[in-house]
């Protein structure tokens, strides 16, 4: 009888599978100790870390003296990097038991490491001692350290840097070119890395357990300039930037006259108006429309200001709450205040729609020509500091952007905004949209869209006196050559910074750890490829803050499952990996309170192993001094989130132990240096440097390995990959991503030693090789189930098997507030301890006789509770999981 017929018989013998509804949620928090039981995989970590030699890169892979190495890491942030000694010992043991073999020390430089020092220039020795002891304990438990040099230190008057609130957050981008900031970065690196750890008795420069050093997190001149955060730099920083720009131009052109000749080619004055009723002199008619949905509550009116008065603006919208904050900069596209208009449109938003972009104000019906410039101008203000968005896009399917998509920072004062953009394609029916209006009051006036607006070198601007201004991201009104020159200037300035810091660390300080600059998508790939390894970050539905950044009362997440979006974050990460270089993802998470978040780490562990990545880090383990809570504390910390922790043995098995095989074929997207520069000239953004922009669909990564090739053969062409339907099967046959049922996607892993299911059940049975999985009724019709053979080569041989099964997990008292669509929030009502969990009813059928199997529910520490019965399906053992056991993990012992 064929294997297929055997399974049919087994399934029929089990009738419809488990039908029991999930009982009430029960408390379950993975214990903070590290007993030697089946859930403790610390034996997989060689001890001490670094005993097998320094990590290095050979043929694009992390290796030590014994062979290839992978990193399954996590992050500690702020004060969590400086625990007391007893806590350092406990956390090191707990991380090791979970299979975590590297800790990224993040946000140390914000305030924590300076301790009692009068400024952020001198490390507090007491803090350094705590860090030293933690790193020592991590090393003893087989855990490497990744040291981040600059994350969130923000210089102020105490360090001799004025105008902090008018500079970019944490001085990012600015620190790529401001000379004294660069010198102070070097001082900090020298002070930290050359000191001798009294517990390991080695300086960090020579410590093999210090595996990685990252120069600056999510920091790049390209990115920060692209966000408009350098548009309104105060002096002396603006002068420094302008002088460096003029020096670069002098080196290229030699004289103002040659510069003028090059830049004035293609200048285009403003043409005829394309919009109607942009001054709101007529009543709202067909020209302007406000898009709403059934949830949207907003009021729109045209107002006229009395003579000599700017027009009254309510302090806040009726029925809304606002938080006032200091306004320090007019924001993108706004060089200064504007005269108050006589007539303006007032939009009072009381409730956003089912999607975050509603309500939105739209005017459509005009045509754009590809590669032609257009200039949008308007005046705008709000009842308090708020953000809005403006875009130019198709007024028809597929609703694609046409060259303009910008955030607008609003204050209570009228500000002029100007955006010059180049149309990305011809379109006969385009539209301008004002959108992302959170609850509040907004006023808009003098809206104009005209072709042209491109200028060359203006009269009075000269290289001899450094008077050629820096190009503002919000005012891309210069000629093609001028824009390209500025992008090339950013490239050269960034390259000199990153490569200069790298040489300082390697040559002057003698750092033996692997050094990375920052993350891809912030900085160009060819620049970051000049360092030791490539790094990236990604989040599935990062929390969004419609108003003030990190406002604990005003945020939402999309409560959606990745399994329903093939590729998602994972294929995009694959599309930025650089062929021939070690690749890590040092931040990844599916943030709370997404109810499907348990899928995140098992999926990226399997996918990363298939893609042959070198390191993956959860973000984060802990952000504070409370290392052992019994509640989920926020979006990111996993320390008390059982849905993420109980699957860690499976993650470590798939990624660290290598249970998931690498792809058999690697697909390369060719991106030469010239091609990357050309894409930056076109888009001005490093976010667009990925395989999908260079002829290879990122979904290829669900079938094969994927990387970008920075040194392609001149004749290289994008490979032809056959399109698949709704089922994506890896070329190894081990990973299946199935979206054949709309809204009912699932992801499975089938290897000899690890099995995984995550997704929607829909009454289906899931064969995982020789193991069969049936899942009963759960609250979301969704679950994540992992199985790991700890000792044996398979599930039919003697040894222990760890099983984890998770469904809904939440704090006691936490209630999601729906905001429309899939958007949800808790505001600041995260609930209280303990974490409450759903017991998943399921049957697991093993390919061994029942008499050979013992089955144990496990307690919060992973210790055995009284044995549960093992049922039979023919000659096969059936493990019955369920809420009656009040646990998320189990142990099966297969006897000889």
Segments (PLM) and residue ranges:
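Long, low-hydrophobicity ectodomains and other hydrophilic envelope-associated domains
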Residues: 652-653, 657-848, 853-857
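Catalytic-core region of carbohydrate-active enzymes that cleave or remodel glycosidic bonds
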Residues: 194, 496-516, 523-541, 556-722, ...
């Amino acid at each position: 009888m064929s294997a297929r017929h055997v399974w049919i018989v087994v399934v029929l013998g089990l009738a419809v599978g488990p039908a029991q509804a999930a009982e009430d949620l029960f408390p379950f928090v993975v214990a903070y100790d590290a007993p030697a039981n089946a859930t403790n995989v610390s034996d997989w970590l060689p001890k001490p870390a670094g005993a097998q030699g320094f990590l290095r890169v050979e043929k694009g892979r992390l290796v030590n003296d014994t062979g290839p190495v992978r990193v399954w890491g996590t992050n500690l942030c702020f004060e969590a990097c400086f625990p007391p000694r007893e806590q350092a010992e406990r956390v090191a043991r707990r991380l090791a038991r979970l299979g975590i073999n590297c800790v990224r020390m993040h946000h140390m430089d914000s305030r924590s490491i300076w301790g009692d020092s009068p400024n952020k220039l001198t490390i507090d020795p007491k803090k350094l001692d705590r860090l030293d002891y933690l790193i020592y304990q991590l090393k003893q438990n087989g855990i490497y350290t990744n040291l981040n040099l600059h994350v969130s230190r923000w210089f102020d008057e105490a360090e001799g840097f004025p105008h902090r609130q008018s500079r970019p957050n944490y001085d990012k981008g600015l620190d790529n070119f401001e000379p004294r900031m660069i010198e102070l970065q070097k001082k900090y690196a020298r002070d930290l890395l050359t000191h001798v750890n009294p517990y390991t008795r080695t300086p960090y420069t020579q410590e093999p357990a210090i595996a990685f050093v990252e120069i600056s997190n999510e920091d790049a001149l390209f990115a920060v300039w692209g966000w408009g955060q350098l548009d309104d730099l105060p002096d002396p920083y603006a002068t420094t930037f302008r002088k460096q720009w003029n020096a670069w131009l002098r080196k290229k052109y030699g004289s103002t006259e040659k510069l003028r000749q090059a830049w004035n080619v293609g200048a285009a004055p403003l043409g005829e108006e394309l919009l109607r009723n942009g001054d709101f002199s007529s009543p709202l008619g067909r020209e302007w429309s406000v898009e709403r949905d059934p949830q949207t509550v907003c009021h729109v009116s045209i107002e006229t200001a009395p003579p000599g008065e700017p027009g009254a603006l309510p302090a806040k919208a009726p029925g809304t709450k606002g938080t006032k904050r200091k306004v320090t900069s007019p924001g993108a596209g706004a060089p200064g205040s504007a005269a108050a208009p006589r007539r303006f449109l007032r939009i009072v938003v009381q409730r956003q729609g089912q999607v975050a972009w509603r309500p939105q104000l739209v005017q459509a019906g005009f045509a754009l020509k590809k590669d032609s410039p257009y200039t949008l101008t308007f005046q705008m203000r709000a009842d308090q500091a708020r953000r809005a968005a403006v875009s130019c896009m198709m007024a028809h399917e597929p609703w694609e952007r046409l060259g303009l998509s910008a955030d607008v920072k609003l204050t209570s004062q009228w500000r002029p905004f100007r955006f010059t953009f180049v149309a990305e394609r011809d379109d006969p029916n385009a539209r301008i949209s004002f959108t992302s209006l959170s609850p509040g009051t907004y006023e808009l006036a003098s809206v104009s869209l005209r072709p042209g607006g491109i200028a060359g070198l203006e009269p009075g601007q000269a290289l001899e006196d450094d008077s050629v201004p820096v190009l503002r991201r919000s005012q891309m009104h210069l000629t093609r050559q001028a824009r390209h020159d500025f992008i090339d200037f950013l490239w050269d300035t960034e390259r000199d910074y990153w490569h200069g810091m790298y040489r300082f660390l390697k040559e002057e300080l003698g750092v033996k750890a692997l050094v990375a600059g920052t993350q891809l998508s912030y900085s160009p790939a060819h620049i970051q490829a000049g360092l030791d390894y490539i790094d990236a970050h990604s989040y599935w539905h990062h929390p969004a803050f419609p108003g003030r950044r990190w406002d604990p009362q005003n945020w939402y997440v999309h409560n959606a499952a990745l399994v329903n979006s093939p590729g998602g974050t994972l294929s995009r990460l694959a599309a930025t990996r650089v062929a021939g270089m070690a690749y890590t993802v040092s931040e990844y998470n599916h943030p709370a309170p997404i109810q499907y978040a348990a899928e995140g780490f098992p999926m990226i562990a399997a996918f990363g192993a298939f893609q042959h990545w070198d390191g993956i880090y959860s973000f984060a383990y802990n952000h504070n001094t409370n290392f052992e809570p019994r509640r989920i504390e926020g979006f990111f910390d996993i320390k008390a989130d059982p849905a993420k922790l109980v699957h860690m043995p499976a993650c470590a098995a798939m990624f660290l132990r290598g249970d998931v095989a690498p792809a058999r074929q690697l697909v390369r997207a060719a991106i030469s240096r010239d091609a990357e520069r050309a894409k930056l000239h076109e888009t001005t953004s490093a976010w667009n440097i990925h395989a999908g922009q260079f002829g290879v669909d990122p979904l290829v990564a669900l079938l094969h390995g994927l990387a970008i090739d920075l040194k392609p053969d001149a004749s290289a062409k994008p490979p032809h990959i056959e399109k698949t339907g709704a089922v994506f099967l890896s070329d190894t046959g081990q990973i299946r991503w199935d979206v054949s049922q709309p809204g009912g996607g699932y992801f499975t892993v089938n290897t000899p030693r690890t099995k995984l299911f995550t997704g929607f059940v829909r009454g289906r049975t899931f064969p995982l090789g020789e193991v069969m999985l049936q899942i009963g009724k759960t609250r979301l019709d969704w679950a994540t189930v992992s199985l790991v053979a700890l000792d044996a080569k398979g599930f039919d041989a003697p040894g222990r098997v760890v099983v984890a099964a998770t469904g809904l997990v939440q704090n006691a008292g936490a209630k999601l507030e729906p905001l429309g669509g899939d958007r949800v929030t808790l505001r600041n009502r995260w609930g209280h301890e303990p974490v409450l969990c759903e017991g998943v009813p399921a049957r697991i059928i093993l390919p061994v006789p029942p008499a050979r199997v013992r089955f144990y529910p496990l307690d919060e520490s992973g210790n055995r509770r009284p044995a549960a019965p093992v049922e039979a399906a023919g000659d096969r053992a059936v493990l019955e999981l369920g809420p009656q056991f009040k646990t998320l993990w189990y142990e099966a012992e297969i006897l000889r």
